[in-house]
Amino acid sequence: MRKRDYLGQLELMVLFAVMRVNRNAYGVLISQEISKQSGRDVAIASVYAALERLEKKGLVTSCLGEPTAERGGKARTYFKPTMAGLKEARDAHGTLLRLCSGLPGLARPIA
């Protein structure tokens, strides 16, 4: 990232999901992980748009897997965080923790 380019909520969620899914992170799995962890359904097109932005910012890289018959001979695109992406995720996580620390109503679990 050239200048300080802050990530939006969806970009952060996608970056965190890529990290959670780990080696085999591709669009559908990333979308499912976001849904599982947040309870929000995210359109696959939105996930791919966020992945494209993250890749342009140098926070994730992509590579093509092997073509498979189940995908009509198409290769799946896999994503992984870069070192800059890992740093951005750590920074964002720390910022959120500091912002939320001591907030009334967040000290105990919400039922």
Which sequence ranges carry the predicted segments?
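Short aromatic/hydrophobic contact patches that present stacked aromatics
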Residues: 15, 78-80
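N-terminal helix-turn-helix DNA-binding core of bacterial DNA-binding proteins
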Residues: 5-46
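Amphipathic alpha-helical dimerization/coiled-coil segments
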Residues: 84-111
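Basic, short loop/linker segments at the boundary and entry of helix-turn-helix/winged-helix-like folds
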Residues: 2-7, 79
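Basic amphipathic alpha-helical segments that dock to polyanions
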Residues: 47-54
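Short, contiguous hydrophobic alpha-helices characteristic of membrane insertion segments
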Residues: 3-4, 58-59, 110
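Beta-hairpin "wing" of winged helix-turn-helix
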Residues: 57-72
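Exposed loop/turn and edge beta-strand positions of beta-sandwich/beta-sheet ligand-binding modules
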Residues: 75
